């Protein structure tokens, strides 16, 4: 199995937010016993959905749960810049298009209990790949081997991919950054996620200055669970 390494500086950053994401993971667990596959999206690019996905997966892995992090943003992956490998690794695109076996793209990491499937090469038609039987079969197979599967999706305010992915999940989380998206767009994104028929867990407010927030240290996930 190929191995990916997360940079030490990124690990240090994750550890600084450990308390917040441990609480977020606890809230996820309290929301239902059968919530295993969770999509994470945002309204716009740059709001922190990839960082949130990585931190949630890291927190579950640190708690002893066998966790898989899937980079579902095959259009414009941010995660490719976080996990590094000296080996040539295939990813989600190659598996869904039938050019590689999933076992070739399933990667171990330098974090115990955390595994990763990268996005792979850019596809000319990523939406069609996500709508394929291969994607549904992949999720159902991986459910058998992992306690939690976190999928980082493209921004739902930009493309429909996030809604397609969420239909195969158990629940979804919407990430928004302070001052990045207007209320109307956030409400529209929430509605799109709810229309998938899967549980909408709530909104994670990112890039919040907790020094001016009345919730203190809880500011980073103060909006979590508000539906």
Curated annotation (Swiss-Prot):
Gene Ontology biological process terms, A to Z: capsule polysaccharide biosynthetic process
Modification after translation, per record: Autophosphorylated.
InterPro entries from the UniProt entry: AAA_dom, Bact_polysacc_biosynth/exp, P-loop_NTPase, Wzc-like_C
Activity regulation details: Dephosphorylated and activated by CpsB.
E.C. number(s) listed in UniProt: 2.7.10.2
GO cellular component, one term: plasma membrane
Entries under CDD domains matching the protein: BY-kinase
UniProt keyword terms in alphabetical order: ATP-binding, Capsule biogenesis/degradation, Exopolysaccharide synthesis, Kinase, Nucleotide-binding, Phosphoprotein, Transferase, Tyrosine-protein kinase
Pfam families, per database record: AAA_31
Pathway the protein acts in: Capsule biogenesis; capsule polysaccharide biosynthesis
Molecular function terms from GO: ATP binding; non-membrane spanning protein tyrosine kinase activity
Catalytic activity: L-tyrosyl-[protein] + ATP = O-phospho-L-tyrosyl-[protein] + ADP + H(+)
Disulfide pairings: none
Keyword Transmembrane: no
Role played: Involved in the regulation of capsular polysaccharide biosynthesis. Autophosphorylation of CpsD attenuates its activity and reduces the level of encapsulation. May be part of a complex that directs the coordinated polymerization and export to the cell surface of the capsular polysaccharide.
Family as reported in the entry's similarity comment: Belongs to the CpsD/CapB family.
Protein name: Tyrosine-protein kinase CpsD
Species this chain originates from: Streptococcus pneumoniae serotype 4 (strain ATCC BAA-334 / TIGR4)
């Amino acid at each position: 199995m190929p191995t990916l390494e997360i940079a030490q500086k990124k690990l240090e950053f994750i550890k600084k937010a450990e308390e917040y994401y441990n609480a977020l993971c606890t809230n996820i667990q309290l929301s239902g016993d059968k919530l295993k596959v969770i999509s994470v999206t945002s309204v716009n690019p740059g709001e922190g959905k990839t960082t949130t996905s990585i931190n949630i997966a890291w927190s579950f892995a640190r708690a002893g749960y066998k966790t898989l992090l899937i980079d579902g943003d095959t259009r414009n992956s941010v995660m490719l810049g976080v996990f590094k490998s000296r080996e040539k690794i295939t990813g989600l695109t190659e598996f869904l298009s039938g050019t590689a076996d999933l076992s070739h793209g399933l990667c171990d990491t330098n974090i115990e209990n955390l595994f990763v499937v990268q996005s792979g090469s850019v596809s000319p038609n990523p939406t069609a790949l996500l709508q394929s039987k291969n994607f549904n079969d992949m999720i159902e197979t991986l459910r058998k081997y992992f306690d939690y599967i976190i999928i980082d999706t493209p921004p739902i305010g930009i493309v429909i991919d996030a809604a397609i992915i969420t239909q195969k999940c158990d629940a979804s989380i919407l990430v928004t950054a302070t001052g990045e998206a207007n209320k109307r767009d956030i409400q529209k994104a929430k509605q799109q996620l709810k229309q998938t028929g899967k549980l909408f867990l709530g909104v994670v407010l990112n890039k919040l200055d907790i020094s001016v927030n009345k919730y203190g240290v809880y500011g980073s996930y103060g909006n979590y669970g508000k539906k």
